[in-house]
Amino acid sequence: MDLERYKEQERRRLDSLLRDRGASPEERRASIQKLRLRQNEYMHDRYNALLTGPAEFWIESERMERYERRQLLGDLWAEGEIAVLGGRSGIGKSIFAVHLATALAAGEAFGPYPAAEPRRVLYVDLDSSPELFARRYSRNVDGRPAPYEFPEGFLRSVFEWDTPLPPGYESMESLIFDSIIESAANNNCRTIIIDSLPQIAAHGKQRNLIDFLLRFKWLRDSGKASILLIAETTPVGRTPDAVSHDIAGPGIVKSVADSIFTLSPRRRSPHV
């Protein structure tokens, strides 16, 4: 088929799809997916590597793709996205993340956010010692500590920072990333929470952290995971109590994120 004839056929398919207002969301989504497959095949044609269509098509296509993604934390985090949770040290980011992971694994609502389907969640805890985690999530029952009952789908991973680098590894960040991928695959987890980026940065170099984040961007783009990264914030301004804060670390943190949200104390109350 010659190039001009192909373009004309694709233009007619796009026009027909956009005019079909009576089709159900499922039918339109299926049509868009088929059209994308055809365009992806054509993308490698030696004549033209661009995918071209009416502006409305791209909006509709993205809307349908977003429609398929389930929300994990309202509009703040959805399936197939990288979200960054920021906050100053000691604000409660880890506790927030553990409670969120628990809700996701149990398929329960989390505060004002509606419940998602139960899922297996890999919580990579690089911050808390075993003693701290046990103390935080135990309660006193008849004078004895009783551990909190987590849902079966909540999985916690820890990393021994004194682990020597195996042959073939040049950075601790690469070892951590590969270990996360291996653990997620072995335990059938597609929802991953990393707690935290500052801990990784403290044990490595900034250029290795950048590579670490870019590999997570690749993981997201491959459609294989939903990722929540825990980060620190620094005050913006000259005073320590500045209201505005920014995500600490290299700028790549903000560029790979689909959304960024923070925990902060209320202005009229010390509580979050």
Label each residue range with its predicted role:
Residues 84-85, 90, 95, 191, ...:
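Phosphate-binding/switch region of NTP-binding enzymes
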Residues 1-50:
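Short, small/acidic-rich helices and loops at N termini and domain boundaries
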Residues 105, 109:
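Gly/Ala-rich phosphate-binding loop of Rossmann-like dinucleotide-binding domains
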Residues 63-70, 174, 241-244:
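Short gly/ser/thr-rich secondary-structure transition/capping motifs
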Residues 96, 100:
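Hydrophobic positions on the alpha1 helix immediately C-terminal to the Walker A/P-loop
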